[in-house]
């Protein structure tokens, strides 16, 4: 059974890196102390893989996990195949997916997660768990072989969702951008995840975690609000 924790971002309000996720992760990984976590660092454009690995190791030290970046393997997918848990960090979703294709990780991750290996990711790491990355917020744009992602959660995800416009901002709001996506892709569902929220996926059910509701948009911006602590079939 799939077991995934998809988190909107690495920070919430003024909290330090990944601090707000620790209670969720402690419960999610309660049975995995001392186990090996394969970490995928490809989204980290402004830091090296070594730096990203160390940052995550330090942030999650209290969970007592063995966190190993996939770049430590002779073949990156070797680390995935040896792991007890898979984690994908945030950053640039285009760079992340491009390198996941280059290192042949998608099928390996998909097979492991469908067989029950826990998966957690934040921001870009949540985005690639969805059907495609076409509702990412990111620049720079690099070109992966396809925008199709892991499809472990078979819908679109939009992390860091903010409703409305800032004063003086004359570009599109997030709702307007998602409306345009749904005009072009009317069969899609988009799960808009505000800061400080997460989806805990267990099999074919999802539970909303955090301090805010998650918004599900469909054709013509029909809204289905997923309330905090609610569980739904997807």
Swiss-Prot record:
What the entry lists under CDD domains is as follows: GAT1_Peptidase_E (cd03146)
Q: Which GO terms describe its biological process?
A: proteolysis
One GO molecular-function entry: serine-type peptidase activity
Keywords, comma-separated and alphabetical: Cytoplasm, Dipeptidase, Hydrolase, Protease, Serine protease
Its UniProt entry gives the catalysed reaction(s) as: Dipeptidase E catalyzes the hydrolysis of dipeptides Asp-|-Xaa. It does not act on peptides with N-terminal Glu, Asn or Gln, nor does it cleave isoaspartyl peptides
Q: Which Enzyme Commission number(s) are on file for it?
A: 3.4.13.21
- Which cellular component, as a GO term, is one annotated location? cytoplasm
Q: Where is the active site?
A: 123, 138, 160
Q: Where in the cell is it found?
A: Cytoplasm
Q: Name one Pfam family in it.
A: Peptidase_S51
Q: Which domain of life is it from?
A: Bacteria
Principal localization reads cytoplasm
Q: Say what the protein does.
A: Hydrolyzes dipeptides containing N-terminal aspartate residues. May play a role in allowing the cell to use peptide aspartate to spare carbon otherwise required for the synthesis of the aspartate family of amino acids.
The UniProt family comment states: Belongs to the peptidase S51 family.
Protein name per the record: Peptidase E
């Amino acid at each position: 059974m799939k077991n995934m924790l998809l988190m909107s971002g690495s920070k919430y309000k003024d909290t330090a890196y990944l601090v707000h996720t620790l209670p969720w992760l402690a419960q999610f990984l309660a049975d995995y102390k001392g186990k090996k976590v394969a970490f995928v660092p490809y989204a980290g454009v402004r830091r090296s893989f070594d730096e990203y690995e160390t940052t995550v190791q330090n942030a999650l030290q209290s969970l007592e996990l063995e966190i190993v970046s996939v770049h430590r393997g002779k073949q990156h997918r070797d680390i995935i195949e040896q792991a007890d848990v898979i984690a994908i960090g945030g950053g640039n979703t285009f760079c992340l997916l491009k390198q996941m294709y280059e290192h042949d990780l998608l099928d390996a991750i998909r097979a492991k997660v469908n067989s029950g290996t826990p998966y957690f990711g934040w921001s870009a790491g949540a985005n690639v768990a969805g059907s495609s990355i076409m509702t990412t917020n990111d620049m720079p744009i690099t070109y992966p072989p396809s925008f199709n992602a892991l499809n472990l959660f078979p819908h679109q995800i939009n992390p860091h969702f903010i409703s409305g416009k800032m004063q003086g901002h004359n570009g599109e709001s997030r709702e307007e951008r998602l409306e345009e996506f749904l005009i072009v892709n009317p069969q899609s569902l988009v799960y808009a995840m505000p800061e400080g929220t997460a989806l805990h996926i267990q099999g074919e059910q999802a539970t909303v975690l955090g301090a805010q509701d998650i918004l599900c948009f469909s054709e013509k911006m029909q809204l289905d609000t997923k309330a905090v602590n609610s569980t739904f079939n997807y």
